[in-house]
């Protein structure tokens, strides 16, 4: 309970989040790593006694809203979702399915965005990645062709090549499921689409 109270005191007790703050905390969205970068410093609320950095979940909530507005402006067929990280692959695939986007999970083949002769060559208008470290090849190629990148970033990530950061635990199974589900729901709402029936459980990877 103390953790919940601490996070709620971050900036605005009257802030109306997309879901109850307790749900972010229960999924571990706020749990960072024992490393921090200067880039992510502004999204960090505090450091625990064990050296673990804690993310500001209000920033997470705000950035999910911003990312949903941003992504909703694109033709979903031209949105590419990428994830190499194990626990992010199913949520990323479900997110793509929910909004009508393309997805590449597992290994990202070099040249996917830059080599027109490659069988699975893709020309997206925007790329969503789960971790700028694990998905570094996709980020590099997106930058080289001038395509914006939306990324889920933990406390240890560099963000200089990211256009829109969603600060979150990008390693946890439940955290990734919640953030991808919520982002899908908000994109659907921004598009004024009806019938979004997915649940968080639909997005959660099996252990």
Curated annotation (Swiss-Prot):
Protein name: Small ribosomal subunit protein uS2
Claim: Mitochondrion is one of the keywords in the record: no
Domain of life: Archaea
HAMAP family from the UniProt entry: Ribosomal_uS2_A
Transmembrane stretches, start-end: none
Family: Belongs to the universal ribosomal protein uS2 family.
InterPro entries associated with the record: Ribosomal_uS2, Ribosomal_uS2_arc, Ribosomal_uS2_CS, Ribosomal_uS2_euk/arc, Ribosomal_uS2_flav_dom_sf
Alphabetized UniProt keyword annotations: Ribonucleoprotein, Ribosomal protein
GO molecular function: structural constituent of ribosome
Species this chain originates from: Methanocella arvoryzae (strain DSM 22066 / NBRC 105507 / MRE50)
Gene3D superfamilies the record matches: Glucose-6-phosphate isomerase like protein, domain 1 (3.40.50.10490)
Gene Ontology biological process terms in this record: translation
Record-level GO cellular component terms: small ribosomal subunit
UniProt keyword Ribosomal protein, yes or no: yes
């Amino acid at each position: 309970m103390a953790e919940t109270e601490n996070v709620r005191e971050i900036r605005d007790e009257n802030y109306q989040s997309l879901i109850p703050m307790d749900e972010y905390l229960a999924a571990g969205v706020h749990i960072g790593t024992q490393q921090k970068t200067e880039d992510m410093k502004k999204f960090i609320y505090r450091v625990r006694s064990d050296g673990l950095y804690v993310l500001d979940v209000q920033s997470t909530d705000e950035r999910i809203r911003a990312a949903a507005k941003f992504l909703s402006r694109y033709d979903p067929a031209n949105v590419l979702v990428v994830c190499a990280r194990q626990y992010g692959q199913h949520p990323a695939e479900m997110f793509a399915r929910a909004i009508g986007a393309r997805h590449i999970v597992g290994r990202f083949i070099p040249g996917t965005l830059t080599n027109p002769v490659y069988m699975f060559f893709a020309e997206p208008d925007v790329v969503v990645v789960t971790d700028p470290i694990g998905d570094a090849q996709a980020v590099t190629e997106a930058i080289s062709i001038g395509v914006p990148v939306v990324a889920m970033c933990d406390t240890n990530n560099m963000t200089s090549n990211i256009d829109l950061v969603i600060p979150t635990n990008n390693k946890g199974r439940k955290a990734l499921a919640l953030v991808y589900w919520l982002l899908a729901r908000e994109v659907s709402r921004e598009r004024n689409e009806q019938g979004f029936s997915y649940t968080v459980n639909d997005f959660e990877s099996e252990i």
